[in-house]
Amino acid sequence: MTQKRVLILTADAGFGHRSAAEAVEAALAELYGDQCVTKVVNPLDEADAPELIRQLEEGYDEMVVEDPALYRIAYHAMGTPLVADIVEAFATRLLNDVMLRLVQDFQPHVVVSTYPTYAQPVALAIKETTQDIALAVVITDLTDVQSLWYSRAATMHFVPTSLIRQQAYDNKIPATRVWVTGLPVHPAIARETRDPLVLRDTLGWMQEIPTGLIVASARTQQMATISRLLDRAQIVLQLAVVCGGDGELFRRLQQVQWHGPVHLYDWVDNMPQMMKAADFIVSKAGGLIVSESLACGLPMIISEALPGQEVGNVRYVVENEAGTWAPGPAEVLATAFSWLKGTPPQLDAVRANAVRLGKPRAAYDIAEGVWGLA
């Protein structure tokens, strides 16, 4: 049996890039088993990665939380051709050695990149090996992406929406090298087909009352207030609050005297089950959480968004009526009330739109595309 080898490059600036990489890896394993050998690597974690560029990744969370205005300026600057060209040249120079070593060590048939600044450095590394290695780019935001994502050296761009497809065309990428697949979410979402009431029973939740899922992290600022406000509202509602590994928030919420049924979690690895058991979700507008929610047909109340790509994610959800933008606890409460208690209740219509937009099998489609390139 001839095995195919796939090297998947990712980053840890935010959750979405690694989650997309792991979704593609899981789909390849499920579809092709031992015929496919995969490796997910963050080049910036490698010992020979330059310290300067590693520090830029490590400072991402701090800048997002403590100085969003600076993040906004940096993001929009990256969207200008001159700055993008400078960043691309800078990254290519600094990452060339580590990229070349990774490719030479693993000997892949295909390299998959889920991070924008990797495309050109790995394309150069592939060229230097003089081997026939395909390069695939998986774009992890829904509407607004920087030109760094697009590489004329890439064999294929797997893009989440028709909007990104048009942007690829505008960046001189041929139509034969662009495939609209959706953003890859873990195959567990497509596999989970149990009835929501069964899932609630499995999770230890009450079965017969509406359920809101609140997803927080160290990057969110309002979820504690939102949780308390929804709990005290005159709505029959149970809450499941996932703190995303933010231990301080988890401990603080454990001290609250809750009025209704509230289930608290520090970190979970069964988000697909929770999403499919809930009636709606309150979250920020990261590409991963938006794509997972839509893949589960879960109406979204988006309470926070980073400048740049997350603003585009909000626009995508709102314009398609699969959720709403509620930038404050009072707005979140008003939306939940109208969805559950309005005349008529609006939740079913929003859910239908989320189902229409969702791409639960995107990771499988990308895996099949990658396999075809090998």
Where on the chain are the PLM-derived regions?
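A conserved, positively charged/aromatic
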Residues: V103, Q131-I133, S147-M156
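A nucleotide-sugar donor-handling region in carbohydrate enzymes
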Residues: T155-S217
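Donor-nucleotide binding loops and adjacent catalytic segments primarily
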Residues: D195-A278
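Acidic donor-binding loop of glycosyltransferase active sites
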Residues: K276-G286
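C-terminal alpha-helical cap of glycosyltransferases
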Residues: K359-A374
